[in-house]
């Protein structure tokens, strides 16, 4: 009887062998690991780097109006030492300073020089206007061997005013300049500190010297400080330069009685530019928007780990050398053991015997899309990508990199650490602030990428679930889920039928009658097979009972005939 039941079950199963369609996603043998908010080292099919590490060791100047100052320092273009004669007026949107560049010829310094340097780097170049000062009773041709052209000379944009004769009286003078332009004027003047009191008397006469400068927003008095100093360029004296930005229609006035280095022309800024100090070679064959001391950063990535002091349209500097952004779904490759099992089970159970669909494993080789189908029917086996769900995921993921760039990119200004002693505290604050910003953005970068990665993985899982639900709603009672991402179909489903499931045009009513009949047969087989163990145990029990009954009957007959005696002892 058991044999009959087993044969019946096998026969019924063979008769109603179901066609099958499975859903899965693309997988690769070696994915890329990314970090999310909740987990580190999750493997995904695709990922892209967000931190640029490649540097172009040149200044890419193609398409730029570039000026290479060479031996001229940027501040020197405003006062005119001999090395800056060709740069007294210029126009540029990329200004290159070199380490060999010098701002001065006669020893001295600029007050608040870094602020002025930043103004000039962004200036787009400078143009000049004569201030119209005239002088009587003094010499205007002071010169020095420290500023040589063909012979001793002086700053081209300044006048060194001296007494008419050595040790002669320097008259009290007042000069004013009104800015009639529509943009601010850069006004620069100097104070000469002689190498000794005797030298000061020789140049400007005896007595205390005082220079006063004022405008509507500025007022300052200066007294020269003569005295011996170490010689530089053969000079023990110093010239300190001061400056102000004079608003339109405002007037600056100078009152002095010696030791005054007078401005000859006012400077006006032309527009906007980038300025960088670098010794990298200029290259007119490449384009760039982000520069640093070592060259150019050409990148569409949101972050860079090349130089924390890059300027221009630059990726944000972060401490991390790599931050991978997921652009594909979670990768669950078929390992070697799984592949061997798949091959073994295919021989026994067909294409889907060991494939666990999107729940346990992806499908390697699904190159036409992220999500897809595999089917098995009387016509054979096949695989197809689902373009709609794939495109839906891609549309939402595309632009992640651009969104990160929008959140992080901005113009950066470079503040060098060329501070004098008075400015060192300011320099320390700037450096501390820069370091703090790097720390904050390094954390922000890691957080932003982790958030996007979490969203990508959740999104791709969601699209997979949507695809699965779409198939389930179409098939309804015509198929049964096997828990592994597959549906056993209870009717004959040829390739056109499979295509209709993929295209969301499947008509479940068309196959309903056949599916119900086949489902009843399969359910009957499952029901009968379920009682097999019960029947086996019942047969075993009945056999034991029959054997015991026969033994008792034989014993009774033997006792009755005297062939067996039973003695009970107490």
UniProtKB/Swiss-Prot annotation:
Glycosylation site positions: 30, 46, 249, 335, 431, 503
Annotated signal peptide: 1-18
Keyword check for Lipoprotein: yes
GO cellular component: host cell plasma membrane; membrane; viral envelope; virion membrane
Chain ranges on the Cytoplasmic side, renumbered to this chain: 555-570
Quaternary structure and partners: Homotrimer of disulfide-linked HA1-HA2.
Entry protein name: Hemagglutinin
Native source species: Influenza A virus (strain A/Equine/Switzerland/137/1972 H7N7)
